[in-house]
Amino acid sequence: MNGDGEKGARGPGAHARKRKVRIGGASGFWGDSALGPQQLVAHGDVDFLVFDYLAETTMSILAGARLRNPAVGYATDFVDIAMKSVLREIVERGIRVVSNAGGVAPQACARALVELAQSQGVALDVAVVEGDDAMPVV
């Protein structure tokens, strides 16, 4: 317990820092409807959009794509369809996006997303998480 008798709160004023965060599930798989992100951005009053693209079959498709062309290996629909239709409004409203669309080529996905933002005349911060590719040691 903290000094206010609340369980779980950490430090003075911890309860005052709590705020509601609205998360919209924009996709559940590669090939999911492109309407989800559009509807969530237009009507969902969301703080975050989450796109889940990866499954075992998808990973094998992306690995094969990367073998043919190292510039791919990510879920291209994320950039070319999903983000293209909502990017400007996402930036204007300060909605944050979390996605695993980078697949086996997260840097390539990030580059494509930055290029899309530039083509739409919007500034976009993009972060990439990588380091889980075990193929070099297999």
What are the roles of these predicted feature ranges?
Residues 3-13:
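Residue-identity detector for glycine
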